[in-house]
């Protein structure tokens, strides 16, 4: 949800349009996915759930709730619970977007371009660590960039193409991420213990958003999980947007 394709602030009619769109959790997303593949496609025992970043967090949630009927999960560069540090980083990115006068508390008549650019510059700073950016690895992404400014302009264009309320909706889902926040479980530890399907957890060794160290206690709390750290200089993007490790 909130991607702009499925139900989102940008395509939902009043009274739940724009900033009035309800908060969506990862469990809301995976339950809708389960309904789609089981009722529409007739898939009741999926072989694998693989996801990167927010998709990795969804993979953990899927495993906690639907692991018994799934062959396995592979979370790439994500955690079962959003850390406080990660939450604060996202809060800063949200505020950067919302500080645009044209944002108008979400009731904008045209895209808040300055706010979207401010978000882009803030968030993009987290994609590589210091060494990755200093070595110019960001210039190797996609078809390559001449310099850092052209890289930033590309990212600005990418994030600028997303509706601001949709983007904020996805960030809200990310911030609320915690597999323990479900009526079936009392806490995160209990939810981790319920991921009975095989799990291959693959963090990036240089990820600033989801450091590999945060997956260590999560994997220890899962009955059938293995941790394989991707040894890379490509930060968060090693899990899904970089063709080079």
Task: Identify the residue ranges that each predicted region occupies.
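Alpha/beta-hydrolase-fold enzymes
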Residues: 69-157
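Active-site nucleophile elbow and catalytic-triad environment of alpha/beta-hydrolase enzymes
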Residues: 151-154, 169-191
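Catalytic histidine-centered segment of alpha/beta-hydrolase-like enzymes
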Residues: 233-244
